[in-house]
Amino acid sequence: MATKNEEILRKPEWLKIKLNTNKSYTGLKKMMREHNLNTVCEEAKCPNIHECWGERKTATIMILGAICTRACRFCAVKTGLPNELDLNEPERVAESVRLMNLKHVVITAVARDDLKDGGAHVYAETIRKVREVNPYTTIEVLPSDMGGSIENWETLMAAKPDILNHNIETVRRLTPRVRARATYDRSLEVLRRSKELYPDIPTKSSLMVGLGETTEEIYEVMDDLRANDVDIMTIGQYLQPSRKHLKVQKYYTPLEFGKLRKVAMEKGFKHCQAGPMVRSSYHADEQVNEAAKEKHRLGELSSK
């Protein structure tokens, strides 16, 4: 029987979506299985999978295996002892992107704290292979903090993705509880370092809300990200993947998300997606286009 608190926090109507399993979605799913690829869309139970795979021709491919060495209390990805690295994965990912005719691909990975380089070399090689085979596909990467190693981060960034995305996930106060093996300041550091290494590559970060944070703490995250030159921010509703994960403390309304987006844009982000169903890679193709337009605009202004 549900508790009184669970009754109060029953999912509101705006979080109920109609699934659209069309031919594009079915084809992409089949392709993923044929090429033995993992996707965070499936592993993390993303609510937007049908829209992204079916309508937008974008996907988030998860490399370095399907088992994460961390056990963040918000995440549905399996945890435990990872498998051996698959050194053929970069070629397989590149060919799959070609066959799926993706306009934009997000390459993410499980945390591999068991590897000295955190998987950076395989990550970088995957970026290079995807670009070699798919020169017109934009590439976004969504790595872990790789233990905070600057050397590992430099290895990854040397492959020059079109967008670097690293998620802050939650506010400073809640970070130890939500993702115990990461730190708030380390995430800010890798975002700052990425921009220092390659100023022309847009940086991006995502925040979940509904874990017990205050509005003031959300604004603090925005300020911290902007202080480290982050260009793009996404804000979405935390949804509990299972009873073992953290409970939802609040469901934000679409109007509240609209206000958060307005504040984020006023604080200087070039682009912000905010909404109940928004996830880190939601409408990622739009974000890379907006970032490219802004880069072009600034280039024109500086030449005048």
Swiss-Prot record:
Record-level GO cellular component terms: cytoplasm
Gene3D superfamilies: Aldolase class I
Recorded metabolic or biological pathway in which this protein acts: Protein modification; protein lipoylation via endogenous pathway; protein N(6)-(lipoyl)lysine from octanoyl-[acyl-carrier-protein]
GO molecular function, one term: 4 iron, 4 sulfur cluster binding
Main subcellular localisation: cytoplasm
InterPro entries: Aldolase_TIM, Elp3/MiaA/NifB-like_rSAM, LIAS_N, Lipoyl_synth, rSAM
E.C. number: 2.8.1.8
Record note on cofactor: Binds 2 [4Fe-4S] clusters per subunit. One cluster is coordinated with 3 cysteines and an exchangeable S-adenosyl-L-methionine.
Cofactor(s) needed: [4Fe-4S] cluster
Sequence positions that bind [4Fe-4S] cluster 2: C68, C72, C75
Keyword list, A-Z: 4Fe-4S, Cytoplasm, Iron, Iron-sulfur, Metal-binding, S-adenosyl-L-methionine, Transferase
Domain Radical SAM core: 53-270
Subcellular localization(s) per the UniProt record: Cytoplasm
Cytoplasm among keywords: yes
Catalytic activity entry: [[Fe-S] cluster scaffold protein carrying a second [4Fe-4S](2+) cluster] + N(6)-octanoyl-L-lysyl-[protein] + 2 oxidized [2Fe-2S]-[ferredoxin] + 2 S-adenosyl-L-methionine + 4 H(+) = [[Fe-S] cluster scaffold protein] + N(6)-[(R)-dihydrolipoyl]-L-lysyl-[protein] + 4 Fe(3+) + 2 hydrogen sulfide + 2 5'-deoxyadenosine + 2 L-methionine + 2 reduced [2Fe-2S]-[ferredoxin]
Residue positions binding [4Fe-4S] cluster 1: C41, C46, C52, S281
Family named by the database record: Belongs to the radical SAM superfamily. Lipoyl synthase family.
The protein's name in its UniProt record: Lipoyl synthase
Annotated organism of origin: Macrococcus caseolyticus (strain JCSC5402) (Macrococcoides caseolyticum)
